[in-house]
UniProtKB/Swiss-Prot annotation:
Belongs to the glycosyl hydrolase 68 family. Keywords: Glycosidase, Hydrolase, Secreted. Gene3D superfamilies: Glycosyl hydrolase domain, family 43. InterPro entries: Glyco_hydro_68, Glyco_hydro_beta-prop_sf. The active site is at D44 (nucleophile), E276 (proton donor/acceptor). GO terms for molecular function: beta-fructofuranosidase activity; levansucrase activity. SUPFAM superfamilies: Arabinanase/levansucrase/invertase. GO terms for biological process: carbohydrate utilization. It catalyses: Hydrolysis of terminal non-reducing beta-D-fructofuranoside residues in beta-D-fructofuranosides. This is Extracellular sucrase. It comes from Zymomonas mobilis subsp. mobilis (strain ATCC 10988 / DSM 424 / LMG 404 / NCIMB 8938 / NRRL B-806 / ZM1). One of its GO terms (cellular component) is extracellular region. Its EC number is 3.2.1.26. It is an enzyme of class 3 (hydrolase).
Amino acid sequence: MFNFNASRWTRAQAMKVNKFDLTTSMPEIGTDFPIMRDDLWLWDTWPLRDINGNPVSFKGWNVIFSLVADRNIPWNDRHSHARIGYFYSKDGKSWVYGGHLLQESANTRTAEWSGGTIMAPGSRNQVETFFTSTLFDKNGVREAVAAVTKGRIYADSEGVWFKGFDQSTDLFQADGLFYQNYAENNLWNFRDPHVFINPEDGETYALFEANVATVRGEDDIGEDEIGPVPANTVVPKDANLCSASIGIARCLSPDRTEWELLPPLLTAFGVNDQMERPHVIFQNGLTYLFTISHDSTYADGLTGSDGLYGFVSENGIFGPYEPLNGSGLVLGGPASQPTEAYAHYIMNNGLVESFINEIIDPKSGKVIAGGSLAPTVRVELQGHETFATEVFDYGYIPASYAWPVWPFPDRRK
C-alpha cells in the first residue's frame, strides 16, 4: 500500500495493552500535587543533554526546558501560545525559572513546540535547540516545521542564563511523499525533532512525529496493519482515519542545518493517530524506540493508555521493531487516574520524566489541570520487556555527568 517498508504497530499488538499492569503504571498522583510556578503552565519537558542522549550539567547546574504559557490562558488553549522556557537547579528537582529561551525574533511562526536541546559536540558552551516552529490560523495548525536555533549557555553561583537564540533555521517539513502534509489532512501531525548520533554508522539523524502520507480516510487498512486478531474481529471503517508514524531524517552538514527525509521507521496506520516526541536509547546491543500517545487518539475499536510506548530492534535504528511488552505500553497512567501525566521522556539512565496533565477529583469528578512536573519513575529495560521499579520526587531530572568545561563562573554583563 505504501511506497516504503516500515515496521508496523498492529491492531493485534495494541489489543494487548493492559491498563492494570503495575509494572507499566505510573504512581497515582493526588489532587494536592505541588505546582512549580503559579503563573505558568508547563508541559513537554526535556533536559540539556549531549548528542548521545545523556543529560548533562553545566558548571554545577542541572538545566531543563519546558513548553510554557501564562496560567491566565485557559488550559486547553495553551498550545497556540507555547514558548520554550528554561529552568535550572543544583539538585535536579528544586527548579528556578530563567525565562524564555528564544528571543522574540527567533521564531518566524506563532508558537514554539517540542524538540530537544543539545550541547554542540566539541564546544565549550554552544547550545543548539531543535524545535517545532508552528503556525496557527483560525483552523488550527497550518504549518509545522522542524527548526534549529543556536546560542550559548553561561553560569555563575547564582544561576544560568543564555545568549543568542535570536534567529532560527528551518530544517525539514512534511513532504506529502513519506509524510502527510496539510493538503492531505488538515489534522496532520509533524513535530518534535529529536537529534542523535547513531552508534552503528556514526551519522547524525533526527526522529520526529508524523503521519503516513495518505489522503485522510481514502486508504483501506490491510492485513499487515491488522495482524493476527481473534476470529470475527471487526475493524471499524473509520479506523483508517488514524495514520501515525515515527519519521527519521539524515543530517547532511556538519553544522546540522541541512537534512534529508528518509522513509518512516514505524507506522501505526489503523491503530493510532499520534506517536509524539519520539526518542531513542541504545543499550546492550538493542535499539529502543520510544514515543508517547493518548487513549483518545487510538483508532475506533481500540483503547489504550496515556503514556510512554516503546519498540525494540535487534538490528539497529532502521529495525525491524517489535513492541515492548508485546503491546508497546511502557508506562501509562494508573487505572484510577488514566490522564494524570503525559509527554513522558525516558533518559539513558532509565529515569522517566513527564508532566501532570489532568487529575480527576475523586470526590467531585471535576478535572483539575496540572501544568507542572510529575513524579519521576525508573524503568528498567530487560530485552523485550520493561519494568517500572522506583518512584522519585516530582520533577527529579538529574544530569548523568558534568559537561567538560572550566568550572569558573561566567561574568554577567
